[in-house]
Swiss-Prot record:
Residues 7-23 form the BPTI/Kunitz inhibitor domain. GO terms for cellular component: extracellular region. Keywords: Disulfide bond, Protease inhibitor, Secreted, Serine protease inhibitor. Expressed by the venom gland. This is Kunitz-type serine protease inhibitor C8. Serine protease inhibitor that inhibits chymotrypsin.
Amino acid sequence: HDRPKFCYLPADPGECLAHMRSF
């Protein structure tokens, strides 16, 4: 899954945070 650097979509907040932390 190629998620955007900034999670602004009402998708999974958990995955969003994980991606942000990974970045």
